[in-house]
């Protein structure tokens, strides 16, 4: 973590008020004694110490590069954060002391300067603002770009992996001091820490006119912010243009190195990348109890207005599938699977009903909501209850009428239905027998009538 109290000289407190940024103060010190007895200006920790920090606390710093302890200039946050060129601060002795002049030619993969678990964006913005102010105040000539490592642009969350941001670090030719030949061996190779392949685009050799090399930056577990596309450094006074090897994109596991330029703000805005969310689709899976959300992100770097040749914008599309488990009771049906069948109907019990039962209404289509299906079921059940009650009332009234027509059961109000049916059957048979006898008697009477009529006719003729 960059701060005034670097690991090279932990006992020294930065006294420059311009360099004292609250968000850049260290969260953890390498040694507790240095924290409490660092110097006369060091203040003991108070209750409001965590109010100064906008970022989350990080693990202790990784060991810095092997700087000589007795350097002419004390280390500060700017020298720890920047990779100065020969003419950035105008102090070649400081460049030789820190051995950063020819760092671009040490190894094909640059060194890892920051921790892998740093995350945050406000420190990068303040750092860029501070560097721009320093460059505008005359510390360096305009037009010279410096590679600034932003500790949070492409950093992944703790436990996540970062694809590694890429940027261009333009180094002008400078010789490497002899006493700094050993830091390259102590630096960590990014291929060891981050074994995944990273696509690097080598830019061709550019002429004296400055051009822009677009860079893409994205993270797997977190969407990265737009990274400033670097501008290649102009040719030196000797006439040698910046080589393509020096303008290679840096690839680290925990950081994105940015190139900070003191050009106009509109030029920097033209060189920023645009991250467009192309599609955010959310589909439901009917086979399991989880929903899958897919985010498709397209990163399109803008081409610089300064370049003579127009570079082709590279697009990096990331898809992030996040299984969302919103159901904890796995015995219950899934909320994402729409039920195609209505709830089972209760069996209808009939008591000696001669009427055939109605067929069960088929299940509703799955387009109907459960609330509508429940309301229809309750209405159907209510109608069924009404019809069943009416049927029972009609049956009871029929039994009462039948009981009233049976002479033996007229005064028996507590007669059972079986008794009513038996007595009514006997009474019907008795009535039928009586009817038959009456019919026979009627026939006899009619025959007697015919005989009497014949006698009357015979009497008149005589």
Swiss-Prot record:
Compartment(s) where it occurs, according to its Swiss-Prot or TrEMBL record: Nucleus
Alphabetical list of PROSITE patterns matching this protein: BHLH (PS50888)
Domains (record comment): The 9aaTAD motif is a transactivation domain present in a large number of yeast and animal transcription factors.
Phosphoserine, modified sites: 259, 261
GO cellular component, one term: nucleoplasm
Described function: Positively regulates the transcription of MYCNOS in neuroblastoma cells.
Domain bHLH: 379-431
Region (Leucine-zipper), start-end ranges: 431-452
Annotated region described as Interaction with AURKA, given as residue ranges: 19-47
InterPro entries according to UniProt: bHLH_dom, HLH_DNA-bd_sf, Myc_transcription_factors, Tscrpt_reg_Myc, Tscrpt_reg_Myc_N
PANTHER family to which the protein is assigned, alphabetical: MYC PROTO-ONCOGENE
Sequence motif 9aaTAD, residues: 76-85
Protein name as it appears in the record: N-myc proto-oncogene protein
Gene designation per UniProt: Mycn
């Amino acid at each position: 973590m960059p701060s005034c109290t670097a690991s090279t000289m932990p006992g020294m407190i930065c006294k420059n008020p311009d360099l004292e940024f609250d968000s850049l103060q260290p969260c953890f010190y390498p040694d507790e004694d240095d924290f409490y007895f660092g110097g006369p200006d060091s203040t003991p920790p108070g209750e409001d110490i965590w109010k100064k920090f906008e970022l989350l606390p990080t693990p202790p710093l990784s060991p810095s590069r092997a700087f000589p302890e007795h350097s002419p200039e004390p280390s500060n946050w700017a020298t720890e954060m920047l990779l100065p060129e020969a003419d950035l601060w105008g102090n070649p002795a400081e460049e030789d002391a820190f051995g950063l002049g020819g760092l671009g030619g040490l190894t094909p993969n640059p060194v890892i300067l920051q921790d892998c678990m740093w995350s945050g964006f406000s420190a990068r913005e303040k750092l860029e603002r501070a560097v721009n102010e320093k460059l505008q105040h005359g510390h360096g000539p305009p037009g010279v770009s410096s590679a600034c490592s932003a500790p949070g642009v492409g950093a992944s969350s703790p436990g996540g992996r970062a694809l590694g941001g890429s940027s261009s670090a333009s180094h002008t030719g400078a010789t490497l001091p002899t006493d700094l030949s050993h830091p390259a061996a102590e630096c960590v190779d990014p291929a060891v820490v981050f074994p995944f392949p990273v696509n690097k685009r080598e830019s061709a050799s550019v002429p004296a006119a400055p051009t822009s090399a677009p860079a893409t930056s994205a993270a797997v577990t977190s969407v990265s912010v737009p990274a400033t596309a670097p501008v290649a450094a102009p040719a030196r006074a000797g006439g040698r243009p910046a080589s393509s090897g020096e303008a290679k994109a840096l690839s680290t596991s925990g950081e994105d190195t940015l190139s900070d330029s003191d050009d106009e703000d509109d030029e920097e805005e033209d060189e920023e990348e645009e991250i467009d969310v192309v599609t955010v689709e959310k589909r439901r899976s009917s086979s399991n109890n989880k929903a899958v959300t897919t985010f498709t992100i397209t990163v399109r770097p803008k081409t610089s207005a300064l370049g003579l040749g127009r570079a082709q914008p590279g697009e990096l599309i990331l898809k992030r599938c996040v299984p969302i488990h919103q159901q904890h009771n796995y015995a219950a049906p899934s909320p994402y699977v729409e039920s195609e069948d209505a709830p089972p109907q209760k069996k209808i019990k009939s008591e000696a009903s001669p009427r055939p039962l109605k067929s069960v209404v088929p299940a509703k289509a799955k387009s109907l909501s459960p609330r509508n299906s429940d309301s229809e079921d309750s209405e159907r059940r209510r109608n069924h209850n009404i019809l069943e009650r009416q049927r029972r009332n009609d049956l009871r009234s029929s039994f009462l009428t039948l009981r009233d027509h049976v002479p033996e059961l007229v005064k028996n109000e507590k007669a059972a239905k079986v008794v009513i049916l038996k007595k009514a059957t006997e009474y019907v048979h008795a009535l039928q027998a009586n009817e038959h006898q009456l019919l026979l008697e009627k026939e006899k009477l009619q025959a007697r009538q015919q005989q009497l009529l014949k006698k009357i006719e015979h009497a008149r003729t005589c």
